[in-house]
């Protein structure tokens, strides 16, 4: 027996009882997200320039990134984790629509794949707040700043590895077309591979330099 509203996801036999079709277009979903993200980055950049301590441009950009990634983890990913019936809501929220759209690139989200929910849950509950703490640590010049950044980056990279490896092991058949594979599955996640890698390397060097400095002092 078919669904009242056939879903657009792959594989076609995916069972989604009560599925409610998307009510917003791709543009209506992406434009507000991108506009809000740009506004956030601009706001953090401007605020970071007024900190009581002088910050380098690198630190200000890092504050922008950690604010963006922290709020993304908490708000966007958090709504996925704690709204298991987002695909069947008769009056869907904007975030329900976000995840129904993204699921065209990875149907494990709309299918509530246990591994995916687990990774996103850890990300939303632990890495989200830790990312916002990194904003404060950088602004305040806290001694734990680089250790915190390095740790969160490792968590993000581990999450990405699990995300991609489980997709491969499960058959790589979760997207509706090559466009959604490259735009959503690869493109939307690439920032959380490239940027955390760069930050982790930088923080590792800073931590090593600090330990080396302590060794010189104790000689």
Curated annotation (Swiss-Prot):
It catalyses: lathosterol = 5alpha-cholest-8-en-3beta-ol. Residues 58-200 form the EXPERA domain. It comes from the Eukaryota. Pathway: Steroid biosynthesis; sterol biosynthesis. It is found in: Endoplasmic reticulum membrane. Pfam families: EBP (PF05241). It is a multi-pass membrane protein. Keywords: Endoplasmic reticulum, Isomerase, Lipid biosynthesis, Lipid metabolism, Membrane, Steroid biosynthesis, Steroid metabolism, Sterol biosynthesis, Sterol metabolism, Transmembrane, Transmembrane helix. The chain crosses the membrane at residues 29-49, 62-82, 119-139, 181-201. One of its GO terms (molecular function) is cholestenol delta-isomerase activity. Its EC number is 5.3.3.5. InterPro entries: EBP (IPR007905), EXPERA (IPR033118). GO terms for cellular component: endoplasmic reticulum; endoplasmic reticulum membrane. Its main location: endoplasmic reticulum. GO terms for biological process: sterol biosynthetic process. Catalyzes the conversion of Delta(8)-sterols to their corresponding Delta(7)-isomers. Belongs to the EBP family. This is Probable 3-beta-hydroxysteroid-Delta(8),Delta(7)-isomerase. It comes from Oryza sativa subsp. japonica.
């Amino acid at each position: 027996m078919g669904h009242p509203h056939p879903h657009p996801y792959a594989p076609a036999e995916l069972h989604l009882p009560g599925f409610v079709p998307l009510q917003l277009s791709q543009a209506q979903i992406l434009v507000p997200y991108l506009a809000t993200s740009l506004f956030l980055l601009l706001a953090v950049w401007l605020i970071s320039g007024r900190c009581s301590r002088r910050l380098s441009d690198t630190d200000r950009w890092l504050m922008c990134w950690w604010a963006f990634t922290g709020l993304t983890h908490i708000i966007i990913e958090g709504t996925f984790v704690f709204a298991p019936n987002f695909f069947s809501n008769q009056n869907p929220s904007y975030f329900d629509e976000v995840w129904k759209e993204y699921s065209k690139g990875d149907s494990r989200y709309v299918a509530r794949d246990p591994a995916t929910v687990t990774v996103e849950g850890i990300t939303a509950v632990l890495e989200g707040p830790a990312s916002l703490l990194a904003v404060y640590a950088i602004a305040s010049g806290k001694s734990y700043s680089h250790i915190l950044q390095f740790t969160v980056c490792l968590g993000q990279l581990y999450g990405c590895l699990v995300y991609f490896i489980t997709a491969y092991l499960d058959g790589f058949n979760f997207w509706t077309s090559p466009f959604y594979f490259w735009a959503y599955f690869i493109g939307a996640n690439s920032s959380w591979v490239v940027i955390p890698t760069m930050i982790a390397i930088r923080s590792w060097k800073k931590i090593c330099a600090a330990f080396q400095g302590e060794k010189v002092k104790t000689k």
